[in-house]
C-alpha cells in the first residue's frame, strides 16, 4: 500500500517536472510606452475597444446604481405619499410594505 502511494507520488512529480515550459514575450515595456505617451487620449481609452467598453459599462452601472439608491431613499422617506406610483418599480421592500399594509387594513 505504501509502495503504491510512493509510486503515485513519483509519477505526479515526473509529469510536472518534465512538462514543457512555454515562454511568453514580455509585453510590459510596450504597454508602458503606450500608456506613457502624451497624445491627448484619456488614459482609460488607450487600451482599445475592450477598455472603452469596460469604462462605459462601469459608468452606466455606477450612474444607474446611484439613481436607484436615490429612488429607494425617496420611497423609504415617503411611504404614505404614493411616490411608488410616480416611478413604478417592484422591489422586495415595496412588496413587503404592500403586503403588510393589506394585513393591517383587515
UniProtKB/Swiss-Prot annotation:
GO terms for biological process: mitochondrial electron transport, cytochrome c to oxygen; mitochondrial respirasome assembly. It comes from Homo sapiens. InterPro entries: COX7a, Cyt_c_oxidase_su7a_sf, Cytc_oxidase_su7a_met. This is Putative cytochrome c oxidase subunit 7A3, mitochondrial. CDD domains: Cyt_c_Oxidase_VIIa. GO terms for cellular component: mitochondrial inner membrane; respiratory chain complex; respiratory chain complex IV. The lineage of its organism: Eukaryota, Metazoa, Chordata, Craniata, Vertebrata. Coiled coil: none annotated. Residues 1-23 form a transit peptide. Signal peptide: none annotated. The keyword Kinase does not apply. It comes from the Eukaryota. The gene is COX7A2P2.
Amino acid at each position: 500500500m505504501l509502495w503504491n502511494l510512493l509510486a503515485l507520488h513519483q509519477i505526479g512529480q515526473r509529469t510536472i517536472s518534465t512538462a514543457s515550459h512555454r515562454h511568453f514575450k514580455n509585453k510590459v515595456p510596450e504597454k508602458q510606452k503606450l500608456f506613457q505617451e502624451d497624445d491627448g487620449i484619456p488614459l482609460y481609452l488607450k487600451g482599445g475597444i475592450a477598455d472603452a467598453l469596460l469604462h462605459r459599462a462601469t459608468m452606466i452601472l455606477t450612474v444607474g446604481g446611484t439613481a436607484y439608491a436615490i429612488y429607494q431613499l425617496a420611497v423609504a422617506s415617503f411611504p404614505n405619499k404614493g411616490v411608488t406610483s410616480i416611478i413604478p418599480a417592484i422591489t422586495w421592500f415595496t412588496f413587503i410594505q404592500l403586503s403588510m399594509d393589506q394585513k393591517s387594513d383587515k
